Amino acid sequence: MNTFIYVGILGALGYSEDFKMMIQNGFTRKYIFVATLSMFAFIGGIMSLADTVAGNLLHYFAPDYNSLFGVIYGYGDILPNWIWLFLLYMLIGSLFYLTALAVHKLEKTLSLCLVVALAGLVLLAVALFRYVLTENIVENIRELASRAMGFMSGGTINYLFPLLTLFLLAAVFYLGSYAIIRRTEVK
């Protein structure tokens, strides 16, 4: 959980005065974005490796300790654990980076309106699932989400699907970030 907070703060601070300094020193927006993405990947990879090793060792010596991956998918598969955590950290970093870029790009009033609209969409989605959609549709959506996270109908776990899901979500957020950074002016 501490790593989530660190990666989130890193993502939020990934766009700062460094952007203005790099633009003024001749770096292109593409290189700035690639450098930021590389920084997130390097730090996320190291942190996920450390969390994987620490989580598995702690669970081995203290069976009451559980890591996030261990609770969801179980222990024993270290490589999927490391890749899953890496992609999860990349997803969190990309989400916060996109948020920081959007807040910087939009003015304060528009940013607040966007936050209120997103909160309204979450409440609307909850209301749709609870009161509007039929139980069959909700069950199909739940089944799709379960399969996207790797849980198959026979009780087996497919590690490829959650890795692809996390990768695609992170890629969407990074593409959104790149689209914003391409149009951002230096203030």
Which functions belong to the PLM regions below?
Residues 53, 57-63, 122-144:
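Juxtamembrane non-transmembrane "cap" segments at the membrane-aqueous interface
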Residues 1, 39-106:
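Secretory targeting signals
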Residues 15-41:
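Helix-loop-helix units of permease transmembrane domains in multi-pass membrane transporters
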Residues 50, 108-122:
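Central hydrophobic cores of alpha-helical transmembrane segments
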Residues 69-70, 135-158:
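Short, membrane-exposed interhelical loops at transmembrane-helix boundaries
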Residues 3-4, 75-92, 153-171:
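Hydrophobic alpha-helical transmembrane segments
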Residues 99-105, 169-187:
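Junction motif at the cytosolic side of a transmembrane helix
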Residues 1-14:
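Membrane-embedded or membrane-proximal helical elements that form or frame transporter/channel pores
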